[in-house]
Amino acid sequence: MYPRLKIYLKRIEENTRVIRQLCAGYGIRVMGVTKACCGAPELAEAYQAGGLAMIGDSRVANLKKMENIKAEKWLIRPPMLSEIEDLVRYADVSLQSEMETVRAINKECEKQRKRHKIILMMDLGDIREGYVDEEELIAAAVETEKLSHVDLYGIGTNLTCFSFIQADEEKMERLAEMRKKVENAAGHTLEIVSGGNSAALDLMMRGGICEGVDNFRLGESLLFGKERSRYTFLPGTRNDGFILECEVVEAKVKPSLPWGTAGVDSYGRKPVFTNRGEKRKKVICAIGRQDFDAETATPVDEGILILGASSDHLMLDVTDSVKEYKVGDIVELRLGYFSVLRAFTSPYVEKIFLKK
């Protein structure tokens, strides 16, 4: 049945091993993020096989899927108050920026007779989650340390996700300095200072991560073998862990340019087309924007050009391919991060996990 997404777990495992070893050389421990694959336990197992002991996701529902995975599990998005019961049940660690939530977690832990680890987040410019005021963060740390059923595990920051503010030496030094202030105020040595995501790898390799920052939350780099700051591939990794197969439903010769009065698309944009001639071999595949992101997909056949997609049609120019595509043929696409995220979320895409 098509479309279907093939996930090559051994390739992801090898990426994980290479990047874990790379980070270890700089004193950085890695937590593997599964959110692009909707918390698939198979992905968590590939991370574990690559040497990771910490697994994280942004949704409690995804952590629930990994209930039987023997790893330290993190919730990497501040939880809703309405899901605290399940958070305590399925997560060992969570990133927090509101003491009201931390208090609710402490109360629920008492009910469930469990303990939960808290990482307090500091906003260093991305204006997403975290404390901006240092004194507020310190006060939160002191209060957390006094609570009966939660542990002050560490502090962290998030960059390059909303405003796409980059990690730099100054921001990492400020985070490390905050570690000292929190430890002095709370009278407690922090086990974790989480300095960011795959976008921080470039800074790390340039020697820009100072002592005191010891953890990264990585997803994209493990899955696709590249850091997110400059989008360069890391040595020894590969980017073919996710191959989408889609079926051709129309194959015809058509002009490269549309004709008639042009309007805007469903996203408020006016499409732009390049004149490649009056006779181009084009195919339509039965998949669209509801199922994947055409902008972060690359045809395996280098002779294919992605023209664009509507909600459930993918238009391709196959004129330069050595293969003569016809109805019923299969086109393979190598997927990037957002394309994988959308494909995993779509119920119309079959997922096939391959242990190779």
Predicted segments, located by residue:
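Alpha-helical packing segments of well-folded alpha/beta enzyme cores
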Residues: 12-15, 19, 178
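Glycine-rich phosphate/diphosphate-binding loops that line cofactor/substrate pockets in enzymes
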Residues: 20-24, 113-114
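Short aromatic-glycine motifs in intrinsically disordered, low-complexity regions
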Residues: 1-2, 139-142, 146, 229-239
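N-terminal capping/small domains of soluble enzymes
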Residues: 16-18, 25, 36-49, 62-63, ...
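Active-site-proximal beta-alpha core segment in soluble small-molecule metabolic enzymes
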Residues: 6, 28-173, 177, 185
